[in-house]
């Protein structure tokens, strides 16, 4: 059955045919398609924000501290992101739920990486140094997250931590 679909300018669309080859891709596409032989992935190009709070970070002198913050990130490699996260588009009604699930998975991945980076950083500090190292930690997280292999592998780019 032939259908028509129009996507927003903030949505990157990848359309594949029955042979698995990409037929078209780009921002805000508008096209007719056969839903029996066409696969569509819709990846948002907007920035995402997520918060974290860890209560189980241990310092060098075995003191427990809490660390919290926010992370902003975008998808900058749409094909890599679509391979690692399900962005398949079936109909407009289910897309919002699918996008919410995808964002949740991406946020969990990034938060896991952030927790590892923070734990390693704080493990080298005593409690006094840890409490006073807020700016140093932020700078280290910004630098390490922007170049982290796993973040790049998922097609993501961290804007700010």
Identify what each model region corresponds to:
Residues 1-50, 108, 112:
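Domain-core and long-helix interface of multi-subunit machines
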Residues 6, 13, 47-161:
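Amphipathic, interface-forming alpha-helical segments with heptad-repeat character
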